[in-house]
Curated annotation (Swiss-Prot):
Keywords: Coiled coil, Cytoplasm, Cytoskeleton, Nucleus, Phosphoprotein. Residues 170-182, 349-363 have a biased composition (Polar residues). GO terms for molecular function: structural constituent of cytoskeleton. This is Spindle pole body component SPC42. Residues 319-329 have a biased composition (Low complexity). Residues 60-137, 249-298 form a coiled coil. Belongs to the SPC42 family. Forms a polymeric layer at the periphery of the spindle pole body (SPB) central plaque which has an essential function during SPB duplication and may facilitate attachment of the SPB to the nuclear membrane. The modification Phosphoserine is found at residues 213, 217, 284, 329. Component of the SPC110 complex containing at least CMD1, SPC29, SPC42 and SCP110.
Length: 363
């Protein structure tokens, strides 16, 4: 029992379940349970009967609306992600399209320039062929013929009855023969000069391939123009050469090119790494070699100093005894030789000493 003069001051309403046993208001009565879903007996109270049907329908409708809202938000996010990805793809395709348009323009310009060059070369070739033909086969001029031939009036011509045998020749035929002989001589001279020129050009070509080609002939003019322009066919598959390449072909070609470049970069990195390792190894070996050489130079200097400072008179070895004077002992060579000479005794004296009876010392 609370012995305080003011007991209500120390009791609170929130702690009814934990009141003292001697508290009079709750001594013979059960306090109300904290969980309102259960009655005093312990059975569950059916609260659904208390809630009206309209409230239930409203809650169900609200729950369904909330669920639908969540689903729609999820679908909206998915659609937004798809739109974002499509925008990225469209930007990449647009950039590629611009690049390919620029490439096509450049190729068209190059093609136009090449066509102009080909037309110029063909014109030069035709001019050279025509000049060569003119030089090789010049036009033979017809003999001089009078435009207004004199009408033959045999009545007015006085022909002698007795002509000399040498005078029977026609002057026109003699003129023709002389003209043909002159033309033959000219042709021969032109052929000789042409042969000399061709030989000179061939020699100059053999001496220097960068000079001009020899005079065009019907044989070497048949060569294709592509060989003269040094055109080379692409060795690798290139879809951009096609007239209308597909996007898949272009992307595959670009990915292959990127892969090839990456492989080349990796190969170069590997070579550089190996070279660095070799350089480091070379430096370490050079340092080690210098250290060993310095150590050997230092040991040689120490040995020379010891030999110069060595005094055989005061030298004492641990193995210096009457029995140890072999060259394999610790003594140096000179000391061992001296020791051998000192201890060398004749065999007779040595034997007598061994068999002699010991004499006692004089007291």
């Amino acid at each position: 029992m609370n012995g305080s003069p003011t007991p209500k001051r120390y009791s609170s309403k929130s702690s009814r379940l934990y009141d003292d046993y001697y508290n009079i208001p709750y001594q013979y009565s059960n306090p109300t349970p904290m969980n309102r879903d259960y009655n005093d007996v312990g059975s569950r109270i059916n609260a659904d009967k208390l809630v009206p049907e309209e409230y239930k329908r409203n809650t169900e409708f609200i729950n369904k609306a909330v669920q639908q809202n969540k689903e729609l938000n999820f679908k909206l996010r998915e659609k937004q992600n798809e739109i974002f990805e499509l925008k990225k793809i469209a930007e990449t395709l647009r950039s590629k399209l611009e690049k390919y348009v620029d490439i096509t323009k450049k190729l068209e310009d190059q093609n136009l320039n090449l066509q102009i060059k080909i037309s110029d070369l063909e014109k030069k070739l035709s001019d050279a062929n025509s000049t060569f033909k003119e030089m090789r086969f010049p036009k033979v001029k017809d003999p001089m013929v009078d435009d207004d031939p004199v009408s033959e009036n045999y009545d007015q011509i006085n022909v002698p009855k007795h002509r000399a045998p040498d005078a029977t020749g026609n002057p026109r035929t003699t003129n023709k023969v002389s003209n043909t002989s002159d033309q033959d001589s000219r042709l021969k001279a032109i052929e000789r000069t042409l042969s000399v020129l061709t030989n000179y050009v061939m020699r100059s070509e053999d001496g220097n391939n960068d000079r001009m080609s020899p005079l065009p002939s019907p044989l070497n003019t048949i060569l294709p123009i592509n060989n003269r322009l040094n055109f080379q066919e692409p060795k690798r598959y290139n879809p951009t050469v096609k007239v209308n390449p597909s996007d898949d072909d272009i992307m595959m070609y670009e990915s292959a090119e990127l892969k090839r470049v990456e492989e080349e970069i990796e190969e170069l990195k590997r070579k550089i790494l190996v070279r660095k390792k070799h350089d480091l190894r070379k430096l370490s070996l050079n340092n080690q070699l210098q250290e060993l050489q310095s150590m050997m130079d230092g040991d040689d200097n120490i040995k020379l100093d010891n030999v110069s400072k060595h005094n055989h008179a005061t030298h004492r070895h641990s193995s210096q005894s009457s029995r140890d004077y072999s060259p394999s002992s610790d003594a140096c060579l000179e000391c061992s030789n001296d020791l051998y000479e000192k201890n060398r005794v004749k065999p007779e004296n040595n034997m007598s000493e061994t068999f002699a009876t010991p004499t006692p010392n004089n007291r």
